[in-house]
Amino acid sequence: AAITLSPETSAQLRTFAQGHHVTLNTLVQGAWALLLSRYSRESEVLFGTTVSGRSADIPGIERMVGLFINTLPLRVRVAPDAVLSEWLRALLERNSELRQFEQTPLVQIQSWSDVPRGQAFFESLIVFDNHPLDESLEKATGLTIQGVTLQGQTNYPLTLNVLPGKELTLSLWYHRNRFRDETAARMVRQLETLLRAIIQNPRARLGLLPLLASAERAQVVGAWNRTGRAYPADMLANLRV
């Protein structure tokens, strides 16, 4: 399941992030935390986030070839009365605190927690691709690459892959033995709805941010509740139930 935001909406998200001194990654993490909280009905959620691993204090690390990425757990409290803009800044600070563990294996981090070994630490992951393929190649060679499709797989039931650029793309990879196709598609649409709500209501309370788009809300509230029927005037009341 995937969705590509329009250039206008993508630009608005970048402008919002810059204006509120957060990152685009923070906005996506915030929307994902809100979505997980609504689905689980929990005030605290835990999901994985990938880090580059290249901010470590190692001489010459920026010139080293190979993968340094690591996956770290991000625990987020979603208080319904929290102010969105302040909550996002706190989320950014939480990400900054995680940097000290960039080189720490996830299995070691789990050993420090109350989650037993062998039990899933978390069941969803966000992968934010800071270096889109086409932009990197264009800068290096002057060539434009089009029609590229990326496919990936992780061991987590849900993986949100975020591809920034002129048009922000959100791709949700999921295990079909856990989630139906229509459920994954709905989650991606609701994620877009939350992102749009974030840039429109920076001072909103978290609990008031909409999960349904206008058309979906109209269907649920209006169309699905049109259950009125005409009954004969002389019918007994107990027969109308």
Residue ranges with predicted function:
Residues A1-A185, E192-Q200, L208-S214, G222-T227, ...:
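Adenylate-forming
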